[in-house]
Amino acid sequence: MDNLNVFANEDNQVNDVKPPPPPPRVCARCDSDNTKFCYYNNYCEFQPRYFCKNCRRYWTHGGALRNIPIGGSSRAKRARVNQPSVARMVSVETQRGNNQPFSNVQENVHLVGSFGASSSSSVGAVGNLFGSLYDIHGGMVTNLHPTRTVRPNHRLAFHDGSFEQDYYDVGSDNLLVNQQVGGYGYHMNPVDQFKWNQSFNNTMNMNYNNDSTSGSSRGSDMNVNHDNKKIRYRNSVIMHPCHLEKDGP
């Protein structure tokens, strides 16, 4: 029994010992001696695989030589060129595009200032403000178009009276001068026009009565002076702000 165990141990030791590497061989392609053994192909001792340091190619002893270019199997690390990624470039362009409309909004807000200074320029600035808000982001002002009609949430006060406007065109540059705003026509309220005319006539009559009771008789020239004064007064008087009503569908 003991003899059997000794033979078994000797067989295991013999099997565990690796065979010595084959001697270096000359390169089959360039005939260079600067070669080294790498491994056995398919774990077969009859197919040792070598590497030539001169032409930097592999070959198997006793096997066919493949047409491999010089240095084709080299895995040297190549220097990478730092190029900006596409996502980073898109994000930069998006930020650049979003910052520009906000600058326009700030300029328009600065131009609006007080509405009493200039009615036409202020309302035009409001129109440009809404146009810039539409360009910022489609989700923020989804249903608002620069050329559509919107309804204001407040009234604009000019001079001493109040100017009420039910609809105005956001995309228009001068909203008060145009006769049609947002596709709707506007006309003066007959009641307000009658009151203004009556007030104007009363003022003229009072001036005429004062001139007639002053004791100075001008004869036929009084009517001419009265007409000239009336024309000058009409040109110099500032029309009282009135209410505009919507005339349209």
Curated annotation (Swiss-Prot):
Zn-finger region bounds: Dof-type: 25-79
Alphabetic keyword roster: DNA-binding, Metal-binding, Nucleus, Transcription, Transcription regulation, Zinc, Zinc-finger
Pfam families with a match to the protein in the record: Zn_ribbon_Dof
Positions with a binding annotation for Zn(2+): 27, 30, 52, 55
One Gene Ontology MF term: DNA binding
Subcellular location: Nucleus
Domain of life: Eukaryota
InterPro entries the UniProt entry points to: Dof, Znf_Dof
Classification via PANTHER family: DOF ZINC FINGER PROTEIN DOF1.4-RELATED (PTHR31992), DOF ZINC FINGER PROTEIN DOF4.2-RELATED (PTHR31992:SF126)
Protein name: Dof zinc finger protein DOF4.5
